[in-house]
Amino acid sequence: MPATIVDYEDASVEVHRLVVGPVDNNVYIVRDRSTGQSVLIDAANEHDKLLELCQALNVRQVVETHGHWDHIQAVEAVRNAGIDVAVTSADAGMLPSYDQLLEDRSIVQVGNLRLATIATPGHTPGSMCFAVEGTPLLFTGDTLFPGGPGNTSFEHSDFATIITSIEDRLFAPFDAGTLVLPGHGAGTTIGAESPHLDEWVERGW
């Protein structure tokens, strides 16, 4: 199995991270310790490594935070290995193929893991975050990073929309200690980022 970074672990869950591809995407595998089953967040790249991880950690489901090219390069490979891939309807057209559509405020269950879906448009129209119930874990894709929101210079991106998503769907409902695990780079917490929202609005990015 490829060496991974363990970003979080407790009695019930562990989070493995592998950094892949030309723009250093974070691929997360969230494993339910009670059943050994896992969910993979963003089949980004380096499919050979991801397939090894999928086998070693018993990945049963892939969910995509959004449809940008750097987050989906291994989608075909994991589907060919028999693992279902889910994405929002708004971003589904960006993927080469998929199996399921994700809806806002729903639950993705793998083993005893329950991932709550949170629609956070702005970076893309169909961007989605995932919170693991009963843990402080929040996977934000390219919506929220240390120091601000994701890039909104792309076609179909919108700065005002991503700010609203962050304020209403992430900062308002989640505790300060919530761990933010983004699609690239290091993690942060809601408490470290939420005081800076007005600064981000003022600077415009």
Predicted features and spans:
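Conserved beta-strand hairpin/beta-sheet module of binuclear metal-dependent hydrolase folds
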Residues: 3-57, 130-141
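Short beta-strand or tight-loop elements
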Residues: 11-13, 111-116, 126
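Short Gly/Pro-enriched turn/cap motifs at secondary-structure boundaries
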Residues: 18-20, 99, 119-121
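Active-site HxH/HxHxD metal-binding segment of metal-dependent hydrolases
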Residues: 24, 38, 45-116, 195-199
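Divalent metal-coordination and catalytic microenvironments
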Residues: 30, 42, 66, 78, ...
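Short, glycine/acidic-enriched loop or turn micro-motifs at the edges of active sites
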Residues: 34-35, 45, 69, 91, ...
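Active-site neighborhood of phospho(di)ester-bond hydrolases with catalytic His/Asp-centered motifs
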Residues: 40-41, 60-68, 85-89, 120-122, ...
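Metallo-beta-lactamase
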Residues: 124-205
